[in-house]
């Protein structure tokens, strides 16, 4: 125990630890920068994945044009420009609940969860077909 913890304990002040701190991470008023052209929504953190870099390349985008959010964060997003969304989830209810938060949607791509998508050639082909549609 450090000095601060001991002092709080002596004063009778309870310390609380968040059970799921990632839920609160950046949860209030996420404003989307002007350079963002794609928002990925996934329960996993995919921002540093080489596969995401390949998807961005197929969309003629760079890493700085992509914003990766989770399903808890998207409801707090503020977007003013037309944008593409890529929703990664096998849960169709979760996707249906998320669609109203896809503001200024130019296109919405859907894929299974990131874990499934990485190893599923059919899912990759389906994403490619979605990208090719006007």
From Swiss-Prot:
**Which keywords has UniProt assigned to this entry?**
DNA replication, DNA-directed DNA polymerase, Nucleotidyltransferase, Transferase
GO BP terms, alphabetized: DNA replication
Q: Would you say which domain of life the source belongs to?
A: Bacteria
Q: Which Pfam families match?
A: DNA_III_psi
Task: Give, as one word, the top-level EC class.
Answer: transferase
The Enzyme Commission number assigned here is 2.7.7.7
The reaction(s) catalysed by this protein are: DNA(n) + a 2'-deoxyribonucleoside 5'-triphosphate = DNA(n+1) + diphosphate
What molecular function does GO assign, one term?
A: 3'-5' exonuclease activity
Signal peptide range equals none
Keyword Transferase in record: yes
Q: Which InterPro entries match?
A: DNA_pol_III_psi, DNA_pol_III_psi_sf, DNA_pol_III_psi_subgr
Biological function = Part of the beta sliding clamp loading complex, which hydrolyzes ATP to load the beta clamp onto primed DNA to form the DNA replication pre-initiation complex. DNA polymerase III is a complex, multichain enzyme responsible for most of the replicative synthesis in bacteria. This DNA polymerase also exhibits 3' to 5' exonuclease activity.
Protein family membership = Belongs to the DNA polymerase III psi/HolD chain family.
Q: Which NCBIfam families match?
A: DNA_III_psi (TIGR00664), PRK06856.1-1 (NF005335)
Give the record's subunit note.
DNA polymerase III contains a core (composed of alpha, epsilon and theta chains) that associates with a tau subunit. This core dimerizes to form the POLIII' complex. PolIII' associates with the gamma complex (composed of gamma, delta, delta', psi and chi chains) and with the beta chain to form the complete DNA polymerase III complex. Interacts directly with the chi subunit (holC).
Q: How is this protein named in the record?
A: DNA polymerase III subunit psi
Q: Which organism is it from?
A: Haemophilus influenzae (strain ATCC 51907 / DSM 11121 / KW20 / Rd)
- Lineage from the top down? Bacteria, Pseudomonadati, Pseudomonadota, Gammaproteobacteria, Pasteurellales
